[in-house]
């Protein structure tokens, strides 16, 4: 019984015991990883320092699942900031943000080589290494560094340098997307071009990917702010007397920057959606205009066909009384033209009625769709009919005397309004 308790106690105290108890062999974790190592003063200790994954896990007390956050694979991994290891000198912070994959310890930091095929990411990583070296150099006397309350701990200074580089990268990408999309949107305001629509589609896809990337980074920072335990674990050394205010202000400031970038990207996407809707409306209107023109041409063609039909009947080699008269030619031409014009006028009138959108009652729609001359004739007939009925009223009764002129005046005003 004592041996089992001693064995359990040894597993808790030994951070390297997990590697043997989980049956992970060097053959399984034999791949190599390379990293650039900086010490607490910003001095480069190792450049492209290579080590096997197995040795790396044993040295830092990590689990194989933690390799996913720093594995230099081309597969995009969700951004993360995780505290790992046991209390004391074995504590570390795993950071995976965009092109930066780092392991932060209390006295050094490892920046892993991503070996990305994207040249821009490789260039950004090289610039970050140069910036990190300058930011970690002590600007005050190292002997007084631990007594100066304005200086952040080493792990927080490294984390801040990473966040500064990430926010700068996001802001730079956003400005590129804004410049490209604004040029396309301004061009679409003048005229709708097929090539510009294709460029707008590509730009919309790019800004959507950027928006998703920025949202993930903002969510990581918000999760840190919501958990006091996670914020406390970011201190790898001694905890300050003022509590978590220092690290909380640090994470909160960059969380706000990430949120601003997300909002700007969201506004751009909304602008693109509005432009797409307007373009669709314009395209639909042009399509409807072309269809209307086609219908008008078809109607005119039908009118000519009616006239041609009459001419074809007259041109048949059959005897009839028309050919013996002098007015036959004029009569046939007149009938053909009149028939074609009537058919064309009737079909165009029907097409005009179809274009009307009923906003009120059917009676109002039918009245509005009638030609002005026809409305005037109908109003005149109604007025005469009403006046004839009024003339037939028996005016011999005393009550009706003297009121005929007033009633007639009112009816005249009503019929005038009706017209």
Swiss-Prot record:
The chain crosses the membrane at residues 297-317, 328-348. GO terms for molecular function: cardiolipin binding; magnesium ion transmembrane transporter activity. One of its GO terms (cellular component) is mitochondrial inner membrane. It is found in: Mitochondrion inner membrane. It is a multi-pass membrane protein. Its main location: mitochondrion. The keyword Nucleus does not apply. A motif (YGMN) lies at residues 314-317. InterPro entries: MRS2-like. Keywords: Ion transport, Magnesium, Membrane, Mitochondrion, Mitochondrion inner membrane, Transit peptide, Transmembrane, Transmembrane helix, Transport. It holds the Pfam family MRS2-like. PANTHER family: MAGNESIUM TRANSPORTER MRS2, MITOCHONDRIAL (PTHR13890:SF27), RNA SPLICING PROTEIN MRS2, MITOCHONDRIAL (PTHR13890). High-conductance magnesium-selective channel that mediates the influx of magnesium into the mitochondrial matrix. Essential for the splicing of mRNA group II introns in mitochondria by affecting mitochondrial magnesium concentrations, which are critical for group II intron splicing. It also suppresses a variety of mitochondrial intron mutations and its absence may disturb the assembly of mitochondrial membrane complexes. Belongs to the CorA metal ion transporter (MIT) (TC 1.A.35) family. This is Mitochondrial inner membrane magnesium transporter MRS2. It comes from Yarrowia lipolytica (strain CLIB 122 / E 150) (Yeast).
């Amino acid at each position: 019984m004592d041996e089992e308790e001693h064995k359990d106690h040894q597993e808790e105290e030994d951070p390297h015991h997990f590697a043997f108890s989980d049956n992970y062999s060097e053959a399984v974790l034999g791949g190599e990883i390379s990293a650039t190592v900086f010490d607490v003063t910003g001095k480069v200790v190792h450049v492209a320092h290579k080590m096997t994954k197995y040795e790396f896990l044993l040295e830092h007390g990590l689990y194989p699942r933690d390799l996913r956050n720093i594995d230099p694979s081309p597969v995009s991994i969700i951004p993360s900031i995780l505290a790992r290891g046991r209390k004391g000198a074995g504590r570390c912070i795993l950071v995976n943000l965009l092109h930066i994959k780092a392991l932060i310890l209390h006295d050094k930091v490892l920046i892993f080589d991503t070996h990305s095929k994207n040249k821009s990411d490789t260039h950004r990583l090289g610039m970050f290494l140069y910036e990190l070296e300058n930011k970690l150099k002590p600007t005050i006397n190292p002997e007084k560094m631990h007594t100066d309350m304005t200086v952040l701990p080493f792990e927080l200074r490294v984390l801040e340098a990473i966040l500064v580089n990430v926010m700068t990268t996001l802001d730079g990408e956003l400005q590129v997307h804004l410049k490209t999309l604004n040029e396309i949107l301004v061009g679409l305001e003048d005229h709708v071009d097929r090539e510009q629509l294709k460029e707008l589609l590509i730009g919309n896809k790019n800004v959507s990917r950027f928006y998703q990337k920025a949202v993930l980074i903002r969510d990581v920072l918000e999760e840190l702010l919501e958990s006091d335990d996670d914020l406390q674990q970011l201190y790898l050394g001694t905890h300050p007397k003022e509590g978590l205010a220092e690290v909380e202000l640090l994470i909160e400031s960059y969380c706000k920057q990430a949120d601003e970038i997300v909002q700007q990207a969201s506004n751009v996407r909304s602008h693109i959606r509005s432009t797409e809707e307007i373009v669709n409306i314009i395209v639909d209107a042009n399509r409807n205009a072309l269809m209307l023109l086609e219908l008008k041409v078809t109607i005119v063609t039908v009118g000519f066909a009616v006239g041609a039909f009459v001419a074809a009947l007259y041109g048949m080699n059959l005897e009839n009384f028309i050919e013996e008269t002098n007015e036959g030619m004029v009569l046939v031409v007149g009938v053909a033209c009149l028939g074609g014009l009537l058919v064309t006028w009737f079909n165009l009138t029907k097409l005009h009625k179809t274009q009307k959108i009923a906003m009120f009652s059917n009676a109002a729609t039918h009245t509005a769709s009638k030609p002005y001359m026809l409305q005037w004739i109908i109003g005149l007939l109604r007025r005469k009919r009403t006046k004839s009925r009024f003339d037939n009223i028996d005016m011999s009764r005393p009550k009706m005397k003297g009121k005929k002129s007033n009633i007639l005046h009112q009816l005249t005003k009503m019929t005038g309004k009706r017209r």
